Amino acid sequence: MEILLDEPINLEQVADLCAIGMKRKPPTPRNYSLWHVSNLLQSGHLIAKGDIRYHEFEGAPYGIMSWGRIFESAIDCYLTHYAVNLGGFYTPDVESIKDDILGSLDGMMWLPDLGWLVCETKLRFTLNGEIPLSHLQQIRAYCHLAETDIVCYVSGHITSRPPVAEARMRIVKLTEQSIHETWQGIVSTKECLIGHGCCPIGNAV
C-alpha cells in the first residue's frame, strides 16, 4: 500500500459547503435479496470463529449509524468541491455488482492525474489515525468492483475526552495482489455459506 496524499480536512470549510449543499437523489434502499460485500466480510469473521451464518443487520438503525450517514453527506459536499477544483468530478452513492455480490460504494471520483478513485468515508470515535483492517478489506473489495487500485479514504474522528473533532483525507494506492486476495476471500465466504444452506434474508423461504 502506498500513500499518495495525507492531509487534514478543514471542517469549517465542510460546514460552509454543506450550507451551499448539493443536489442529489436519495440513496437506493438496500436490496436484501443480494449478497453484500460488507455482510460477507462480517460473515467471514464469524465463520473463522465457527459461527457459519450470513451476517445481516436487522431492525432500526442506531443513532450512531445515522451520525455516520450525516458525516458522509457532509463529506460528499467536500469531495465534490475538491474534485472540481482539480478538474475532475465526484459521484456519490455508486453501486456495482460482480460474481452476484453487490458493493455499495460511498462514491467514485475521477481526477486528471489519477483517473478513477474509490471513495470511502468513515466516522470513528477515536483519534487513532490508522486505517483498520476491516476498512482496508472493504475498500480492496470495492476497488475490485470498480477496476481501480486507488482509494480516497476520508476518516472523521470524534472524542469526548478531550473534546476533539477532526477529519483527514488520504489517497492510497493498493497492491493488485491485496485486491485480488480480498475478493477471492469474499467469493469463498459466499460459496461456503451457500454450501451450508445460508442466503440473504430477502431470499429466505
Residue ranges and their predicted role:
Residues 1, 81, 113, 203-205:
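Polar low-complexity intrinsically disordered regions
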Residues 1-78, 82:
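Charged, glycine-rich intrinsically disordered N-terminal tails and low-complexity linkers that flank
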Residues 40-46, 192-205:
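Cysteine-cluster motifs in flexible loop/terminal segments that predominantly coordinate metals
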Residues 65, 84-194, 198-200:
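Nucleic-acid nuclease catalytic cores
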